UniProtKB/Swiss-Prot annotation:
Motif (TonB C-terminal box) on chain: 607-624
Family: Belongs to the TonB-dependent receptor family. BtuB (TC 1.B.14.3.1) subfamily.
Compartment(s): Cell outer membrane
The TBDR beta-barrel domain, residue ranges: 159-624
Signal sequence coordinates: 1-22
Keywords for the protein's UniProt record, in alphabetical order: Cell outer membrane, Ion transport, Membrane, Porin, Signal, TonB box, Transmembrane, Transmembrane beta strand, Transport
Extent of motif TonB box: 29-36
Originating species: Vibrio parahaemolyticus serotype O3:K6 (strain RIMD 2210633)
Pfam families assigned to the protein according to its UniProt record, in alphabetical order: Plug, TonB_dep_Rec_b-barrel
SUPFAM superfamilies found in the cross-reference section: Porins (SSF56935)
Source lineage: Bacteria, Pseudomonadati, Pseudomonadota, Gammaproteobacteria, Vibrionales
Claim: Ion transport is one of the keywords in the record: yes
Membrane protein topology class: Multi-pass membrane protein
Entry protein name: Vitamin B12 transporter BtuB
Amino acid sequence: MKKSALAITLASLLSPVSYLQAQEISVDETIVVTANRFKQIDGAVLAQTVTVTKEDIRRQQADSLFDVFRTLPSIEVAQYGGRGQSASIFVRGGSATQVLVLVDGVRMPRAIMGGIDFNQFPINSIERIDYIRGARASIYGSEAISGVINIITRASIDDDASRVSAGYGSNNHKKGTFAVSKPVGEGKHIKGVLGYEKTDGFNVKPLPGLNDGDEHGFETLNLKLGYQQNFSDNFSGYVGFSTYSNEYDYDNSSYGNPGWGTVDKHEKKTGEVEYVGADLSLEYSKDVYTSELKLAYGQQDNYDLKSGQSKSTGDHVAIEQFNAIWLNSYSINDELSIGGGLDYRNEKLAKGYLAPSDWGPAKDYNPEKNPRTNIGISAIAQYALNAWTFEASVRNDENNQFGNNTTWQTAAGWKVYEGYELTLSHGTAFRAPSFVDLYYPGYEMPNLKPEESKNTELSLSGVASIVDWTVTGYYNQIENMLIWKGAGMQNIGEAEIKGIELEVKLDTDIVSHEFYLDYKDPVDKSGAEDTQLAYRSKRGAKWNAYATFDQWTLGSQYLYQGERFNGSTRLPSYSLWNFTASYAVNSSWDINAKLSNAFDKNYEMYSGYATPGRQYFVSADYRF
């Protein structure tokens, strides 16, 4: 099946589910197709991109997206404790709300409340993760200021990888998965994944003499179903369904303050997340033209209550989201390709209730615009000639609350000589305020404006012998940043982030290596004096290494995180080591073991919250 350079570009940036899983692609230009890796036409994608396959995830023996993200370049992670606790990611120094997170090319519903708690998403159904750094709002719209992460759960149509797995580890951590992914006839495929996980956890917020002996655990049950079919050589379709139900404990205890008239409070709370989603996509592709239509619906309920009480006694936030996306690409000739997208999004806060608490009586969210709708129209053009590639994109978002937002991006790539390429890009981006920013009960600020940014970056990449390397410098200016002050959120923030990244990948005999270094200066310019942006470090380093020999696969992951600040509170730098081992008993059975935080490092990601010490997990996989 023939795909143009732009078709692949659009696929990777707009809707990678269909295109990146193509097994055979024929074009007039050189294509790099590496098994279980990112597929692209040479020079087609002028952005820094990393793809993580399900094989990579299994090799890491990751429990969650948190485990995966912390191994990727220019991502800092932070969570309030262990498995299942609230977590955030910071890409290139941007905030947790300035990175766009997609599932199969569609926004996660929770984003309308501000930020994505990716620790709640089941990892056992993931086929691939595409991670793009830099501003991409001219393709995706709101939130794509510092990067885009697309979590892909749709399998390729010829995937045949059914398995059963079970494991046990520290803190009474139990996990099991039953997964079927296989062809069921000519051009037909089914996928089904059922997973369960539970851990007792540990005390994530120890307050001596107040909550001694408390444990804050996590439990999840999840299901993913998918069916796809090639109706003809040119026409295909897919339908999917997913649901998960999670429960996690956290601590809301506090010491009393006699001066304020408060007393010690020991309070354990429980959060519950219930998600249901379905999606349908149809794709037509013939010669130089490709078109895809995708419809998706998602509903998520979040409950927050005192442990042991019923859900009716606590907070309840319910979100509904509907997406309709239509993408088209056309190759005019061997040099020039064009494409465009139209997407409609309807976001509804179906329920927004805050139960009575120490802070006051019961309250309800009362959005002025509910549901909130957004229509985005985007266009992209790419011209490739000899050693040069040029790309330009523009997008307009019409929102029934914020009006019009237009973003654009230009990029150029120059193959200096064989194996070396220089790329330069500049683009604008924005982030629309969330319902929490706008309508948090008692602190409503309905007139907030979107955050805005300008991003410029320069990259040089090369392949020399066994070494594949890239150096990237970037400069991101963010204005109208939303900051909590006084009676609520205000557009008074400003940030300036300069950074440089180094990626090196190489193989030495039986060992494959990935080195990531980053240095940045994340400056908060909102106050009278410049300060370091909260929870962002200036320095970071990561090394992932894996060796395969005989029936063994051994791995190690190293992470260095520089010091961070939260106001005047300093969080020291730390280094962590994880080790993994897998033994293939035969063609069907694997035995796996993982040692996390192997040297039992004591560190903090958020001030006052404990992190996991040394932990082990052992598991067995059976393929059929």
